[in-house]
Amino acid sequence: RNYAAFIEKYYPRIAGSSIIFPGGCEKAAGENGKQEAERNLRGAQDKKEYQISFIGTYTDYRSYLPLIRNSQGIIKKIAAHFLFRMKQHPEETAEKALEESLRKDGIVLSDEEFLEVLDGVKPMIYCIMSYYREKAVKVILEAGITLEVFGDSWKKSPFGDSPYLRIHEAVDMRESLEVMEKSLISFNVMA
């Protein structure tokens, strides 16, 4: 929903923005679909190939820090508050955190300028996203829960040698839908 709202606000010439659920290509129809989904969920744990899967890549959030330190202009001015806001309010979108950071510093931008600044804070967005990915994966693995991950980036993670981390070959978008279908839980951390 947040992506659709963003497109509708900043790119109004794109008609018919909508949410696209990553869980599959077909949606359940009405109450019958809901009842069917509930029936399918019962006993699903025994039928799923994976308990928990994570399609996202691993990037060390610390790798973004030099880019953030070297930021310029408005971006440098709002960097500390923006990062703090994103870390303290993970439920908020990056756009909301940016709006609040700009408001705190009394900076008023046109929509076009806002998009330029949003593009400029991407390293900060990726930093926080990677930070939360690392923390979430750590909690799962420390709990002794097996986590299925995809792609070689996980071999470089601090968890690469964990007996609970199963690293698979990278998957494309279509294959990721198949992984989700085979998973009891599939999670992601996004900005």
Language-model features: locations:
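Short Gly/Ser/Thr- and charged-rich N-terminal loops/segments
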Residues: 38, 42-45
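Nucleotide-sugar donor-binding catalytic core of glycosyltransferases
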Residues: 3-33, 46-191
